[in-house]
UniProtKB/Swiss-Prot annotation:
Protein name (record): UPF0371 protein DIP2346
Stated family: Belongs to the UPF0371 family.
Pfam family, one: DUF1846_C
Natural source organism: Corynebacterium diphtheriae (strain ATCC 700971 / NCTC 13129 / Biotype gravis)
Superkingdom in the source lineage: Bacteria
InterPro entries according to UniProt: DUF1846, DUF1846_C, DUF1846_N
HAMAP family for this protein: UPF0371 (MF_01567)
Amino acid sequence: MVNTIGFDREKYIEMQSQHIRERREALGGKLYLEMGGKLFDDMHASRVLPGFTPDNKIAMLDRIKDEVEILVCINAKDLERHKIRADLGISYEEDVLRLVDVFRDRGFLVEHVVLTQLENDNRLALAFIERLQRLGIKVSRHRVIPGYPTDMDRIVSDEGFGLNEYAETTRDLVVVTAPGPGSGKLATCLSQVYHEHKRGVAAGYAKFETFPIWNLPLEHPVNLAYEAATVDLNDANVIDHFHLAAYGEQTVNYNRDVEAFPLLKTLLERLMGESPYQSPTDMGVNMAGNCISDDAACRHASEQEIIRRYFKALVEEARTGKDSTQSDRAAVVMAKAGIKASQRVVVEPARQVEERTSLPGCAIELVDGSIITGATSDLLGCSSSMLLNALKHLAGIDDAIHLLSPESIEPIQTLKTVHLGSSNPRLHTDEVLIALSVSAATDSNAQKALDQLKNLRGCDVHTTTILGSVDEGIFRNLGVLVTSDPKFQKNKLYQKR
């Protein structure tokens, strides 16, 4: 069922942009739209909703670009944690700059960055503020508010949101986005609404969060995959009891939105006389659930994503020495979905290679459903071996033909070990691809193999040991979805990334 389309991209772009327009018109005045998830690179959505492209949200906003201004926010504590966007391999700090650049390249207005939960002893955050200001970006500092989100008298006062710096915007639709979850988007929106009303400007709030999908069942795999993706935040999908009480309709939301709803409703009532929303679901503008074209395809894709998240949590715990809290949470999500790690079809073939050779093994599932494996040899690591074998299969090249001869590999090994000081003579995936590119000038088979690289995108891979940063980066750039068993090839205290 690899790459079966389950989501109607064009229907989504049209329906979603129209619904946002309608919400702004219904509320009147200025609208702060909290944009959950990732705008440009929503890899998670593209994995669990096959057919949803990573740029689907920004393509939708392109329809109303001239009406939109962007606010990017980042949690100052994430700078202290050196938090990384795993799908891109860059820090949240760098991703803020990348987001500003990409927005501007597409013609969006973006002038402000908001640092949330800022404390004066956070030296990394203060240094980042100076960096942003040197780059000509306006910065607003939002503080840690004691009692948030329960002490409403304090929050909706000069001692709460009033302590936050106001980001002065010029357009009536302000999209608030961030590098990842937990960045303080909701608090940023509420703080801005507070300051707008203090200035006599009518302003409202709405939320655009792709997951959980409110009109899918609570334990639909698409919604469970969201829980698996946020095990580090301990988020959970819940029934929106406010919506059930107000309308008698059962919808799904996530725990932090439900917990924050009394604050939002109270804030809007104090500022506007009444709240336009009776539930967290009312706040949302998400149309994704209406654009699923093949439920079975989305279920299967989401189940595979849950398993990938489980392996990811195990690997992260092995790398950092943390306890099993996150993988335990992911295991609970797998149990809710009624699936097991063994249902990731590339896991057992990779382990069988290791059992047979006593060295790391690797396996990939290709678009045609074929499982191709790779073993560790004196010349190649298992990922490199698998990559060459997969390209040969896709290109229809006989398995007996060597795309790279030992004679072409040995000089590279000599360069690595003799001149560059590496202790590992085996070729990594980047070195294999460079060697293959050189060979393609004189070898038609090598060129045929290179031409198949595009057909690896979206394929699943499993390795029996944790990948180093080089192989991890190559697979990411190829669009391959990799998991690993949570062990290193060498049993050492220090493990090079």
